């Protein structure tokens, strides 16, 4: 049995297209010149279980849009042109288009995420069907997915191997600089406005009973705190969780891949995004996480099935050859040599010294003025409940040492004086909390004196 469209000579095996007992589960994304990676990204998210994939493109020069158009002709994805109004950036423009898109509005579940992000489900068999069974069993209508930052793994050279198999080294799960989120939720365009990290509840519903109906879980299947119904784009210590799922974020990949992207531009027009500071933030390789390999066989089968279509096959390999030709030209330049040297130096920045873009200063008075009555009442209730729990049982002592230290080769680190003892800020052995204490010179005295 095969999928065919009238007027098309090609066929794709029927097992590629997904259906779900939970209805329409839609991925919404934006792309610009992602040609070498499009088919892997599509194949992976079909393997995970999305029934529909809607991708907005702008200013592509490498065949990304042509591949997506062909996928739409085959009934496997939906391509939309991101027509950008003057003065608006591509990402917000695409979100506005998606908000008005009937296919998205008619979806039962929606997740907005980027082309360098791959959903990784630990729960059950790794499919959205099984995950949503568990979500709905808790009478929840959304789940908040925390980023897991994956680095280059020390890879410099370009490779055609799958992204999800090449890069298996990541930041420690308790590294809070990597706790941005994405949200899979039951979308109703009447109540919600789509956002890149999470949807925003429309103002007219804030003072109604509607917020009481919003029940979201964190990435470990525990209830999210009520404040997140209204604001926030990242996890905090009380809400972070990876037991059920995570969003693998491959922002840098290899040095060669990064070089291609640096001179390609990006979907959000951030001119200085691909620099050494960004590399040091995103090139985190402290621990191995190979959970994604659970999808390898299914993803490869779907990927190979997609390549049986001669049009997709031609477009895919043309995109690879185009990227490799551009890289070959660039690799002979002084600029490439300087880029490699700069990125290798940036890779040596210890995780404790990575500088992230500072968050926008919080104005408590402004926030209070914007808060709805429902949000204030909800927040006060949760604060009271936390105080009562703490009064009954004091907080557990923070975990400072990793249970399974990494056996990777030595990494660059700084040494800090703690109670007369010099300790290394070594992410292979200490948790993020422990590293913060070491840098501040406040690591627990009893533990410091008992370390080997």
State each model region's role.
Residues 2-5, 9, 93, 123-349:
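Catalytic-site signature of metal-activated, phosphate-bearing donor transferases
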Residues 51-59, 80-84:
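Short beta-strand/loop segment that forms part of the nucleotide-sugar
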Residues 1-43:
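N-proximal low-complexity "stem/linker" segments adjacent to membrane-targeting elements
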Residues 43-52:
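Short, acidic, metal-binding catalytic loop of nucleotide-sugar glycosyltransferases
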Residues 63-110, 120-123:
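Active-site-proximal specificity loops/subdomain of glycosyltransferases
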């Amino acid at each position: 049995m095969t999928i065919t469209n009238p007027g098309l000579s090609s066929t794709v095996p029927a097992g590629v297209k997904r259906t779900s007992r939970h209805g329409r589960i839609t991925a919404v994304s934006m792309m610009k010149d992602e040609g070498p990676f499009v088919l892997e990204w599509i194949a992976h998210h079909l393997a995970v279980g999305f029934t529909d994939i809607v991708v907005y493109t702008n200013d592509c020069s490498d065949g990304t849009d042509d591949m997506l158009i062909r996928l739409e002709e085959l009934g496997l994805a939906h391509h939309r042109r991101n027509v950008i109004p003057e003065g608006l950036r591509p990402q917000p423009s695409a979100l506005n288009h998606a908000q008005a898109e009937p296919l998205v509005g008619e979806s039962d579940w929606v997740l907005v995420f980027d082309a360098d992000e791959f959903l990784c489900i630990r729960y059950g068999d790794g499919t959205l069907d099984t995950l949503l069974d568990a979500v709905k069993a808790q009478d929840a209508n959304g789940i908040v997915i925390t980023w897991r930052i994956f680095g280059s793994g020390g890879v410099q050279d370009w490779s055609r191997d799958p992204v999800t198999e090449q890069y298996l080294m990541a930041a420690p799960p308790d590294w809070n600089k990597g706790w941005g989120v994405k949200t899979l939720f039951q979308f109703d365009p009447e109540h919600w406005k789509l956002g890149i990290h999470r949807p925003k509840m429309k103002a007219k519903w804030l003072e109604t009973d509607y917020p009481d109906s919003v029940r979201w879980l964190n990435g470990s299947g525990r209830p999210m705190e009520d404040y997140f119904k209204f604001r926030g784009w990242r996890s905090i210590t009380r809400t972070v969780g990876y037991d059920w799922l995570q969003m693998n974020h491959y922002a840098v990949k290899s040095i060669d891949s990064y070089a291609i992207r640096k001179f390609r531009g990006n979907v959000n027009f951030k001119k200085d995004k691909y620099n050494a500071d960004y590399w040091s933030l995103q090139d985190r390789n402290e621990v191995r996480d190979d959970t994604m390999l659970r999808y390898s066989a299914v993803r490869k089968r779907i990927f190979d099935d997609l390549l049986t279509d001669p049009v997709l096959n031609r477009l895919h390999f043309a995109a690879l050859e185009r990227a490799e030709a551009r890289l070959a030209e660039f690799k002979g330049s002084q600029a490439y040599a300087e880029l490699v040297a700069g990125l290798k130096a940036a890779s040596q920045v210890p995780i404790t010294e990575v500088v992230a873009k500072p968050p926008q200063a919080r104005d408590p008075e402004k926030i209070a003025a914007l808060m709805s009555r429902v949000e204030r009442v909800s927040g006060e209730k949760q604060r009271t409940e936390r105080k009562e729990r703490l009064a009954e049982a004091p907080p557990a002592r923070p975990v400072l040492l990793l249970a399974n230290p990494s056996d990777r080769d030595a990494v660059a680190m700084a040494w800090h004086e703690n109670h007369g003892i010099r300790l290394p800020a070594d992410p292979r052995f200490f948790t993020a909390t422990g590293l913060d204490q070491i840098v501040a010179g406040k690591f627990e005295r009893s533990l410091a004196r008992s370390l080997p």
